[in-house]
Amino acid sequence: CWHTNPGGIKEVYPHYVYTGSYIRPVYRDNNPYAGDNNHKIPFAPVVNNTSGSIVGYKYLNMNAVPRDKSLQMQLRLKAEDTDGRIRIMLGSPWTTKGGVEIGLVNVKAGSTCREFYASLSIPAKLHKGKQPLFFVFESETEGQSICEFYDFLMLARP
Protein backbone atom coordinates (compact mmCIF):
# COMPACT_ATOMS: atom_id res chain seq x y z
CA CYS A 1 0.00 0.00 0.00
CA TRP A 2 1.27 3.46 -0.94
CA HIS A 3 -0.19 6.61 0.58
CA THR A 4 0.46 10.35 0.50
CA ASN A 5 -0.59 13.20 2.74
CA PRO A 6 -1.67 16.60 1.39
CA GLY A 7 0.45 18.43 4.00
CA GLY A 8 3.14 15.87 4.76
CA ILE A 9 3.97 14.26 8.09
CA LYS A 10 5.08 16.37 11.05
CA GLU A 11 7.06 15.08 14.00
CA VAL A 12 5.82 16.21 17.41
CA TYR A 13 8.07 14.28 19.75
CA PRO A 14 7.49 11.45 20.53
CA HIS A 15 4.73 11.09 17.91
CA TYR A 16 4.11 11.78 14.24
CA VAL A 17 1.12 13.85 13.09
CA TYR A 18 -0.39 12.89 9.73
CA THR A 19 -2.29 15.44 7.62
CA GLY A 20 -3.80 12.69 5.51
CA SER A 21 -3.94 8.93 5.02
CA TYR A 22 -1.95 6.51 7.12
CA ILE A 23 -2.22 2.84 8.06
CA ARG A 24 -3.57 2.46 11.59
CA PRO A 25 -1.79 -0.25 13.58
CA VAL A 26 -4.07 -3.06 14.71
CA TYR A 27 -3.20 -5.40 17.54
CA ARG A 28 -4.85 -8.80 17.97
CA ASP A 29 -4.29 -9.19 21.72
CA ASN A 30 -7.42 -10.47 23.48
CA ASN A 31 -9.31 -10.48 20.21
CA PRO A 32 -11.98 -13.19 19.91
CA TYR A 33 -11.70 -13.03 16.11
CA ALA A 34 -7.97 -13.69 16.10
CA GLY A 35 -6.91 -15.90 13.25
CA ASP A 36 -4.59 -15.48 10.30
CA ASN A 37 -7.25 -15.49 7.58
CA ASN A 38 -10.25 -14.07 9.40
CA HIS A 39 -12.03 -11.44 7.27
CA LYS A 40 -14.68 -10.60 9.86
CA ILE A 41 -12.65 -7.70 11.20
CA PRO A 42 -10.61 -5.18 9.24
CA PHE A 43 -6.87 -5.49 9.67
CA ALA A 44 -4.75 -2.36 9.38
CA PRO A 45 -7.31 0.04 7.88
CA VAL A 46 -6.17 3.18 6.06
CA VAL A 47 -7.49 6.07 8.17
CA ASN A 48 -7.61 9.89 8.14
CA ASN A 49 -8.42 10.03 4.42
CA THR A 50 -8.67 13.80 4.02
CA SER A 51 -9.14 15.75 0.79
CA GLY A 52 -6.01 15.43 -1.33
CA SER A 53 -4.92 12.09 0.17
CA ILE A 54 -3.95 9.31 -2.23
CA VAL A 55 -3.85 5.58 -1.45
CA GLY A 56 -2.32 3.27 -4.05
CA TYR A 57 -1.85 -0.45 -4.60
CA LYS A 58 0.82 -1.84 -6.90
CA TYR A 59 0.33 -3.88 -9.04
CA LEU A 60 -2.89 -5.44 -10.28
CA ASN A 61 -2.65 -8.05 -13.03
CA MET A 62 -5.12 -6.63 -15.55
CA ASN A 63 -4.72 -9.71 -17.80
CA ALA A 64 -6.80 -11.60 -15.20
CA VAL A 65 -9.68 -9.10 -15.38
CA PRO A 66 -12.44 -10.32 -17.76
CA ARG A 67 -13.02 -8.09 -20.79
CA ASP A 68 -16.44 -9.49 -21.72
CA LYS A 69 -18.21 -8.67 -18.43
CA SER A 70 -19.24 -5.47 -16.74
CA LEU A 71 -17.00 -4.62 -13.81
CA GLN A 72 -17.76 -3.18 -10.41
CA MET A 73 -15.57 -2.34 -7.47
CA GLN A 74 -16.79 -2.98 -3.96
CA LEU A 75 -15.19 -0.72 -1.34
CA ARG A 76 -15.57 -1.57 2.33
CA LEU A 77 -15.28 1.56 4.41
CA LYS A 78 -16.72 3.52 7.31
CA ALA A 79 -18.00 7.00 6.44
CA GLU A 80 -16.86 9.72 8.82
CA ASP A 81 -17.70 13.39 9.43
CA THR A 82 -17.62 14.97 5.98
CA ASP A 83 -19.07 14.32 2.53
CA GLY A 84 -16.58 13.38 -0.14
CA ARG A 85 -15.68 11.43 -3.26
CA ILE A 86 -13.21 8.70 -4.01
CA ARG A 87 -11.85 8.73 -7.55
CA ILE A 88 -10.59 5.32 -8.68
CA MET A 89 -7.59 5.83 -10.96
CA LEU A 90 -5.55 3.37 -12.99
CA GLY A 91 -1.94 3.96 -14.08
CA SER A 92 -1.35 7.14 -12.05
CA PRO A 93 -3.31 9.23 -9.54
CA TRP A 94 -2.99 12.24 -11.85
CA THR A 95 -4.53 12.59 -15.32
CA THR A 96 -1.63 14.90 -16.26
CA LYS A 97 0.73 11.94 -15.78
CA GLY A 98 -1.27 9.39 -17.75
CA GLY A 99 -3.75 8.30 -15.08
CA VAL A 100 -7.26 7.32 -16.17
CA GLU A 101 -10.32 7.61 -13.94
CA ILE A 102 -12.13 4.27 -14.07
CA GLY A 103 -14.71 4.83 -11.33
CA LEU A 104 -16.13 7.19 -8.72
CA VAL A 105 -17.70 6.62 -5.30
CA ASN A 106 -19.65 9.29 -3.41
CA VAL A 107 -19.44 9.03 0.37
CA LYS A 108 -22.11 10.70 2.51
CA ALA A 109 -21.01 11.86 5.98
CA GLY A 110 -22.17 9.58 8.77
CA SER A 111 -23.61 6.94 6.42
CA THR A 112 -24.20 3.60 8.11
CA CYS A 113 -23.56 1.78 4.83
CA ARG A 114 -20.30 -0.20 4.94
CA GLU A 115 -20.12 -1.35 1.31
CA PHE A 116 -19.98 1.12 -1.55
CA TYR A 117 -20.01 0.15 -5.22
CA ALA A 118 -18.63 1.84 -8.33
CA SER A 119 -19.12 0.78 -11.94
CA LEU A 120 -15.75 0.53 -13.64
CA SER A 121 -14.83 1.54 -17.16
CA ILE A 122 -11.35 0.33 -18.11
CA PRO A 123 -9.91 1.47 -21.45
CA ALA A 124 -8.41 -1.23 -23.68
CA LYS A 125 -4.89 0.25 -23.43
CA LEU A 126 -4.91 -0.29 -19.64
CA HIS A 127 -6.64 -3.67 -19.78
CA LYS A 128 -3.35 -5.55 -20.06
CA GLY A 129 -0.27 -6.21 -18.00
CA LYS A 130 0.30 -5.01 -14.46
CA GLN A 131 -1.20 -1.63 -13.54
CA PRO A 132 -1.11 0.40 -10.31
CA LEU A 133 -4.49 1.30 -8.80
CA PHE A 134 -5.08 4.53 -6.87
CA PHE A 135 -7.85 5.93 -4.69
CA VAL A 136 -7.89 9.75 -4.65
CA PHE A 137 -9.93 11.34 -1.85
CA GLU A 138 -11.70 14.65 -2.49
CA SER A 139 -13.92 16.86 -0.33
CA GLU A 140 -15.02 20.47 -0.10
CA THR A 141 -13.96 20.37 3.58
CA GLU A 142 -10.20 20.46 4.14
CA GLY A 143 -8.58 18.56 7.00
CA GLN A 144 -11.51 16.30 7.91
CA SER A 145 -11.48 12.58 7.21
CA ILE A 146 -13.96 11.29 4.63
CA CYS A 147 -13.76 7.65 5.71
CA GLU A 148 -11.81 4.75 7.13
CA PHE A 149 -10.83 2.51 4.20
CA TYR A 150 -10.78 -1.23 4.91
CA ASP A 151 -10.50 -3.12 1.61
CA PHE A 152 -11.76 -3.47 -1.94
CA LEU A 153 -12.83 -6.18 -4.37
CA MET A 154 -13.08 -6.06 -8.15
CA LEU A 155 -16.25 -7.87 -9.22
CA ALA A 156 -17.14 -9.21 -12.69
CA ARG A 157 -20.86 -9.23 -13.49
CA PRO A 158 -22.38 -11.26 -16.37
Predicted regions and their residues:
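Extracytoplasmic
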Residues: 1-158
